[in-house]
């Protein structure tokens, strides 16, 4: 079997990457079980987004602390700073995050986060 790109996994990151590769590539995704059994699909929580620059330092510290300061700081910075664009991509792909009555995105606080910066879809964010 010949392929241009082999992606191991079928979770959110793998799917997002596949969607951002050139369409003329032959892409093969390999997963150990059905996609519906991936951790991403089964996830009930949400996805974090930098709401504004004032939250950057807190978001960075929360992420580093949750990773016991073993995280790669550059990767954490890249993840945080790119999160608004990633969320907009997901919305453009049709992900239906919860909204407030005024139509703005609804945020909640979960886990190690000190601020409300989690977007979610009901209690089935991974399926969405």
Give the positions of each predicted feature.
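Conserved N-terminal/central alpha/beta ligand/cofactor-binding core
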Residues: 35-128
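N-terminal Rossmann-like FAD-binding beta1-loop-alpha1 element of flavoenzymes
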Residues: 3-29
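A short, basic/flexible loop-to-alpha-helix module at the beginning of a structural domain
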Residues: 1-2, 110
């Amino acid at each position: 079997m010949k392929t241009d790109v082999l992606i191991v996994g079928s979770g959110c990151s793998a799917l997002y990457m596949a969607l951002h590769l050139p369409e003329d590539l032959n892409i093969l995704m390999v997963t150990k079980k059905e996609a519906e059994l991936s951790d991403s699909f089964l996830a009930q929580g949400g996805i974090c987004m930098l709401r504004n620059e004032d939250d950057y330092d807190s978001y960075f510290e929360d992420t580093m602390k949750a990773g016991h300061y073993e995280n790669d700081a550059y990767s954490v910075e890249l993840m945080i700073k790119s999160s608004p664009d990633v969320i907009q991509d997901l919305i453009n792909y049709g992900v239906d995050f919860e909204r407030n009555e005024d139509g703005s995105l609804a945020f909640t606080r979960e886990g190690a986060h000190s601020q409300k910066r989690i977007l979610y879809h009901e209690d089935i964010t991974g399926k969405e």
